[in-house]
Amino acid sequence: MPEGDSVYRLARRLRPALVGHRLVHAELRVPALATLDLAGATVTEIVTHGKHQLTRVVRGDGEALTLHTHLKMTGSWTVVGAGKRLPSRLMDTVRVLLELDDGATAYGLDLPVVEVVPTAQEDDAVGHLGPDPLRADWDAAEAVRRLAAQPDRPVAAALLDQRNLAGLGNLWVNELCFLRGTSPWSPVGELDVPALVALARRCLRHSALVEGAYQVTTGDRRDGRSHWVSGRAGQACLRCGTPVRVVEEVPGDAERRRTWWCPHCQPGPGPEPGRTGPAPATQAWDRPLAAGGRAARLTPRSRTGRSRPGR
């Protein structure tokens, strides 16, 4: 499933094509909205909250509406220029069609979530979400409060819960646990939650905003080396050489996503009941992301407190 940084980047690409343009024809191909006519409305904003996209429009009579969509596992958006059409093989997957006054058309394909709400009532759609590190109204203290409210919950499951902190998906949760040097099954109450939240914000913003850094956590964009643990089951840990492990289910996660971790670099509870490792409090991952326009490598501190060089 696309994560918050993915949806943020998608919205950024869609804005030049849609914002400020009038809809000359619109189709919302879901039963509940089949009769809603948005023709004549002007697209005013495209914003995101976590993995949710909010496309705001104002109709000719001044009514402000928001098209709320979510990609989940199947959805995508594409824009074709004037005089061009979407390939016919894809037309059956169209859930949203927005024809613009310059002749371009935006298509939302295979979108599992399509709804329209009054803009003043957007909270009906996204009000349950936690703070989003990519939004201007980001509230770190509130994210910390929500996570800390369930001290016994495994950290990976807590981070995946969009009600705590919006935008983190499986890739970033796995990488954050590695970067903080903690087992994905460590209870939230045993961790430095403010430091975890600060790192999550820094990583998401770096990935979303820095050219060439999208979802690269190691600073190395080569295939198989862009992530510390995600997708690297059975391969040697890039830090210590221990084989990376994977399990199919995150405790408490209904979507049964995979969890990757290095047993040596991420001490603490394991996925098996009762299994534990060395206490995680002896390590911290805190090297800042590079400010330049390239991927940055985050590396851990050793138990002596000296930074290990990236390798």
Each model region followed by its residue ranges:
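Phosphate/anion-contacting hairpin/loop surfaces
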Residues: 62-63, 67-168, 172-181, 191
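Basic, nucleic-acid-binding surfaces and adjacent catalytic neighborhoods in DNA/RNA-processing proteins
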Residues: 22-37, 47, 59, 85, ...
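Gly/Gly-Pro- and Ser/Thr-rich, intrinsically disordered tail segments characteristic of DNA damage-repair
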Residues: 1-115, 236, 292-311
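Alpha-helical structural motif
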Residues: 3-6, 10, 19, 122-125, ...
